[in-house]
């Protein structure tokens, strides 16, 4: 189905590259930034340690391969009458851009730094897809801040202000608002959502696309949730926080604004 993913034109591609360059340029020289190329595949073990199977299992996409035993029956036929799949490999498509960074940091002595990557991300969204704003596959520019609480909190506040300023170029109603993750609705997860909102752990940059409110960026304070699990907080001083910018939604915003894209 075409709303699961998007093929972009040359003009769209040019705008994506300009947009990503603009996002990266918002990081002041005071930040130590490492840029990484991250894969689309992720281990189920990493997802388990991150808590994904309990919080958002409905968003996950399992990677399967065709059952090789079927191929013997292919014979001279052009194709298999019925395709069966084997799911023995414990791999999934990456559901969140920052998740690969945590095992990379395991047992490292980490000081104040930023990890960043442009990542293809996959979320099933319960099958509720909309072209340009809610797809199965989409692209995210991710910034992960690692350091003491003051460093991470100030980084998140810095980027909130800067990305809101950019969004206001295309939508005069753009705003930052308190939010929570769309966890699978168990009783425990409902408590986690309330905890997130009450403690201001998540904010979103909201714009209007096709007359609907859409988040084009999220700002997340993790505390020591990941630094403890992945053993890079040996002195109880290291926390993390991330900023994710949904490239596809930004492109939809720019198109709707009917304004020439200028860096």
Language-model-detected regions and their locations in the chain:
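TRNA-recognition modules of translation machinery and tRNA-sensing kinases, especially anticodon-binding
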Residues: 1-263
């Amino acid at each position: 189905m075409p709303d699961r993913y998007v093929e972009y034109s040359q003009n769209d591609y040019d705008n994506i590259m300009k947009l990503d360059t603009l996002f990266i340029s918002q990081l002041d020289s005071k930040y130590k930034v490492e840029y990484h190329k991250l894969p689309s595949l992720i281990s189920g073990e990493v997802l388990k340690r991150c808590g994904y199977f309990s919080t958002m299992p409905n968003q996950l996409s399992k990677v399967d391969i065709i059952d090789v035993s079927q191929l013997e029956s292919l014979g001279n036929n052009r194709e298999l009458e019925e395709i069966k799949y084997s799911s023995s490999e414990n791999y999934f498509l990456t559901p969140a851009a920052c998740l690969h960074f945590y095992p990379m940091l395991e047992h490292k002595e980490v000081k104040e730094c930023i990890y960043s990557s442009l990542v293809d991300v996959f979320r099933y969204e319960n099958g509720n897809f909309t072209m340009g704003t809610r797809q199965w596959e989409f692209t995210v520019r991710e910034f992960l801040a690692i350091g003491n609480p003051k460093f991470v909190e100030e980084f998140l506040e810095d980027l909130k202000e800067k990305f809101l300023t950019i969004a206001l170029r295309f939508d005069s109603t753009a705003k930052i608002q308190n939010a929570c993750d769309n966890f699978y609705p168990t009783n425990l997860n409902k408590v986690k959502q309330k905890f997130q909102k009450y403690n201001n752990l998540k904010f979103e940059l909201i714009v209007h696309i096709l007359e609907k409110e859409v988040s084009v960026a999220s700002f997340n304070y993790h505390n020591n949730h990941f630094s403890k699990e992945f053993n890079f907080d040996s002195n109880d001083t290291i926390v993390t926080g991330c900023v994710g910018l949904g490239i596809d939604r930004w492109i939809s915003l720019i198109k709707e604004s009917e304004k020439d894209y200028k860096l």
